[in-house]
Regions:
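Active-site loop segments of alpha/beta catalytic cores
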Residues: 2-70, 114-117, 126, 139, ...
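Segments that shape or occlude catalytic/ligand-binding pockets
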Residues: 62-103
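A structural signal for short, hydrophobic beta-strand segments that form beta-sheets
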Residues: 104-108
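Extended Gly/Ser/Thr-rich low-complexity repeat segments
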Residues: 124-138
Length: 392
């Protein structure tokens, strides 16, 4: 039996990538390292081309593409990044997760579904139809102050030595050896609480016990700043903080901008001050939906890069750049909807972003995971047009 080929080998031999011109080197590459190119782009400095990044793909999308020409060895997002030749980034650890998580328990198992309590403590019904649909949530682990004090807070202890047990010498060596942009997780201040409580419960708690919500946010802030600073002391340098919230729907956030500014903005400032202490002037938040009402709150707290800019929800990178100028950095912003339509629509969506990309600090890519209604041919054509327009 012949040895299985590596993903780079599959890429080099792939006929479809060659057909779409995706094996050719970047047309505007003048010798910057990946790190230099990323930093110059996000600092509004002259650059040969913008970095070539993408968000990722639904599992069902990759499964569809296997029937349309994508090698079956490419079966996850990391492998797809390598296969399509996207620019790499190095992520270093900061452990601010639960220690320990809840025990995973199957509470009920039928032909159609399974009811579980996951490692996150959430009781949920997970369907067996083979799709990655959102589970039906039944019960959340954080319902009141007693749950916070007895079940959740002990799992977030910043003094737990297990958080810091890493091969720091090896991590530091990888940072120094690879000329890649280096990112570190800076967690979440409100999105995590929503996950622990559920949307309706956290909305009610903001009114019924706002002191508890702020107490949790403060404790999480201490956990994040402590773990991030420890990691950076060990590693020495970082280029950006990578956060997550996902607290917006199509019509705006699940928390009022007033409360978000009161509770989160000054604490984001403490987190981003730690980043700046170690040379990182880029702080990104991953928030889907319509983020417009929260952008000022993030910017004032030092979170200056918005991602992934879901266009169909009303978050438009062109409008954000017009409003905020060089205060704001952008990543994403390519509406996924036209990718399922045709070449003309794909070209139009990318063309509308050219001037904003040229203005600096904007890395264009699909505004979320590529859904399974996008054909492989359409996606390759999208990559071809993006490469042509932006020199990738």
């Amino acid at each position: 039996m012949a040895d299985q080929k590596s993903i780079p080998e599959l890429r080099a031999e792939d006929k479809k990538l060659k057909e779409y011109g995706l094996l050719d080197g970047p047309s505007r590459d003048s010798g910057y390292t990946h790190r230099e190119r990323y930093l110059r782009t996000m600092r509004f400095q002259s650059v040969d081309r913008v970095p070539n990044h993408e968000f990722g793909y639904w599992d069902e999308t990759i499964a569809r593409w296997h029937d349309e020409g994508l090698p079956r060895e490419v079966s996850n997002n990391w492998q797809a990044d390598v296969f399509f030749g996207f620019d790499p980034m190095l992520h270093i650890p900061a452990d601010h997760g639960w220690r320990p998580g809840f025990e995973h328990i199957v509470l009920e198992d039928t032909d159609r579904y399974r009811i579980i309590r996951g490692g996150d403590g959430v009781k949920a019904m997970v369907y067996k139809d083979g799709t990655s649909t959102i589970p039906h949530y039944i019960e959340f682990p954080l319902k009141n102050r007693d749950d916070w004090e007895n079940e959740i807070k002990p799992r977030l202890n910043p003094a737990d030595p297990a958080r810091y047990d890493r091969d720091w010498e090896g991590i530091r060596a990888r940072v120094e050896e690879n000329q890649l942009p280096v990112a570190i997780s800076i967690g979440s201040l409100f999105g995590w609480i929503r996950n622990w409580m559920g949307f309706e419960n956290v909305a009610m708690m903001c009114m019924d016990d706002p002191e508890l919500i702020e107490e949790i946010i403060e404790y999480v802030t201490v956990l994040i700043t402590t773990t991030v600073e420890y990691s950076l002391q060990k590693v020495g340098r970082v280029d950006l903080g990578w956060g997550w919230e996902d607290i917006c729907f199509n019509h705006g956030p699940i928390i009022s901008p007033r409360l978000f500014r009161q509770w989160c903005t000054p604490r984001y400032k403490r987190i981003t001050d730690v980043l700046k202490k170690y040379g990182a002037d880029i702080a990104l938040t991953d928030c889907d939906g319509n983020i417009n009402e929260l952008v000022d709150c993030w910017l004032d707290g030092g979170i200056n890069c918005m991602f992934p800019l879901e266009v169909n929800s009303g978050t438009d990178p062109v409008a954000l750049r017009q409003k905020y100028g060089e205060r704001i950095l952008l990543a994403g912003g390519v509406n996924k909807i036209p990718l399922a339509k045709g070449k003309k629509e794909i070209e139009g969506e990318l063309q509308r972003l050219v001037k904003t990309v040229e203005s600096g600090a904007f890395i264009p890519h699909v505004d979320h995971r590529v859904p399974p209604d996008v054909s492989y041919e359409n996606y390759l054509y999208y990559l071809k047009v993006k490469k042509h327009l932006f020199g990738m």
